Amino acid sequence: MNDIYRIYLSALRAFVRGSAPEPVPQEQWAALMELARINSTLGILSHVYLNHPDLTPEQLRPVLRRQCLQEAAMYAARGNQMALLAAEFDRAGIDFILFKGFVLRNFYPVPELRTYGDVDLVIRREDRAGSDELMKRLGYEPRDTWEPAYSYQRGVEYYEVHTDVMEVDVSDKADYIAYFSRIWDHTCPSQTLRLPHALEFTPEFHLLYLLTHIAKHISVSGAGIRMYLDIAFFLKRFELDWQWIAGELECLALSDFANVVFCAVEDWFGVECPLPRRSVPAEVMADFLEFTLSGGIYGYAGRDKGTVFLKQQDRSREEKVSRTRTLLHHAFPPVRNLENRYTYLQTKPWLLPAAWVHRLADSRTEWARFAGHTREILSADMDEVKKLKRLYRELGL
C-alpha cells in the first residue's frame, strides 16, 4: 500500500472510530486532498484533520475549514429542501420510499459531510403521473424521463424518482431485476422523515440492496470508497438478522462478493461484520483497494470509458475482449438495454431495429456520444481491460 493510500485510510478510519489519523508529510498534502476530492470525501478529510490541529499545517487550516463549512452548509440546505419536497409528496397522498444517501447520511457522525449527487426516492408505478405533475408544479425541470428512473432538477437540487430500483442484472448468476421488484414487501415507516406516507427499506433488505448496488457499479465502471464507508456505518448502526441476510446473499449469488466487502470494511475502517468470513488473498485485497481508490467515486477517474466498455463484455471470461463486438453492442444495443426508454419494446421486441433508429434520431448528442465512445474503445489499453476483468472474477462477480 502506498503512503497516500495508507494516510487516507487512516483519516477515514479516524472518522469512523473517533481516533487520530496519521500525520501527513508536507509534500503529500496536495495528493491526499486530490484523492479525497475524487472520492467525494474532502469534507470528511478536512473535518478529521481540523479536529487534530497538531497534525495540520497552520497555513492549510483556513482551506480545510472553508471546505468543511461549505460542504456542510450545502448538504444541510439540500437536506432541508428534500424534507420540504417529501412533505409535498405526503400531502398529495403519494407513498414514497427513501433509501441510499439521504437515509445513510443520518448514520454518519456529521450527516452533512455525507455527500451525494442526487436524492433518490421510490414511488409506486401507478403514482408516476401524479408525482410528475407535482414535481413540475413545484418548479422542477424534468431531465431523464424514461422508466424506471425519472430525474428532475431545480438549481443545485437533483432528484431521481424511481418506479423500480434495479433496471439491469448485475450478472447472469441470478435474476436481480425480479428479486428487487418486490421492494414494497420490505418496507417500514421512515425513521428519517416521520411522515405518514414516508417509508424506508427494512435494515436487512437495505443492506442487501446496498451490496447489490455496489456490485452493479463495479460491473459498469467502479465504486468509490464512500460506498464502503456507508457499509461501515450501517454495520455500526444496526443489530441485523444475519441468518436471513446470509440466505438471501446465497439467493443473489453474492455471498463471495459480500465476503470481500466485509473483509475490506474491517481492514480499511476497523468495523467487523458478525458473519463468518473467509480469508481473501492479500494480492486481491491490494488490487481491490487500488481499483476502489484510484477510480474515484464511480470508477471513471483516470480511467477512459473505452476501457470500461470493453471490461463489461463477457465479464466472466478474461480472454474474451473484442473491440468490434463492443462497438456493435453500443451501436445496436439489445432489447433489455432499450426497453425502459422505448417502452413499446416491452410488448413488441421485434421493433428493436426501429428503436435503434429512434435512439439515433432523438438528438445530435446521441451521435456525438457514439462517436466519442468509438474513439475511446479503439484506443483503450487491452492489458488494463484484462486486468479489470480478472479483478471482477476475483471479487466473486
Model-derived regions, located:
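Conserved NTP-donor binding/palm subdomain of two-metal-ion nucleotidyltransferases/polymerases, i.e.
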Residues: M1-G117, I123-L397
